[in-house]
Amino acid sequence: MISVEVFDDRRCWLGEGPTATGENNNHLQWVDILNGKVLSKNIETSKTSEYKMDEHVGFAIPRTDGGHVLGTANGPVLRDVEGNISGLPKRETDTYKSRWNDAKVSHTGDLFLGTLSYDLVPKASGLYRISKDGSEIKKLLSDVTLANGLDWSVDTQTFYFIDSLKHYVDAFSYDGQEITDRRTVIKFGENEIPDGMCVDGEDGLWIAFWDGSQVRRYDEKYKLSEKIDLPVSYTTSCTFAGKDLDQLVITTAHNNEMGKHPQAGMTFICKPGIKGKKTTLFGI
């Protein structure tokens, strides 16, 4: 049994998108989407910080210069270490009011990012790619309802993507630019809602389940191999961190259930016995 403990007791309405940076992968960063916050904590020193934007922030992807790419509702935007904001290419005008949700950087440096409509209109959202130099945005998938977890296999040739309300994980072939050959590799029950995810160093998929109180690992053959139970309902995402990338950090949401679960919205940490991959930074 893998036991968890509280890593950070700041309660997030909707904690999401953890990343680990720094020389020892010890600087954790994540967002509280609906409060527009970007939070951080150092594993080794326990030093914390945060800043707040004036709109919802779906993700905060670290940049090589120390700033972030922020998935603000009207973005995405670049934010430097001094807080200065500059724009990136925008997606097409939304038919339905939408925001950015999850994102990750490929090994080639491109930013993959997805959307959701606030009313969760079926197939009204998409998955996009912003080029590593920030000059171009391209829509990769258009039949998306709630774009969520995404990551790549260790050899980078397989791209994984979760559209939460479809209740499965899709895999694609990836050539460093395009995604092709879409196929479903893991199916869940209609009451199971997969959220954020990450891939470990053995090609296992660690998936957080919204309203499921769990993070699960599926091995390289897509078979369930581990379960991590949490004392909250809404687990949202996870990432590996620490000098040896052997610690799994898990974000959660309180979703107005702090009375039912006192630790709801806090961020947790555990040692699952498997090492992960480093966070890839965005280069501009």
Annotate the PLM regions.
Residues R10-N25, M53-V69, D94-D110, L140-T158, ...:
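Beta-rich, blade/repeat-based domains predominating
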Residues T21-E23, L28-L34, V69-N74, L113-V121, ...:
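Conserved beta-strand positions in repeat-built beta-propeller and related beta-rich domains
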Residues K37-L39, G75-V77, S125-Y128, Y168-D170, ...:
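A short loop-to-beta-strand structural motif that recurs across blades of beta-propeller domains
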Residues N42-S46, D80-N84, S131-G134, S173-Q177, ...:
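Short loop/turn segments that connect beta-strands within beta-propeller blades
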Residues N84-L140:
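Hydrophobic alpha-helical segments and helix pairs
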Residues T239-I284:
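Blade-level signature of beta-propeller repeat domains, shared across WD40, Kelch, NHL, RCC1
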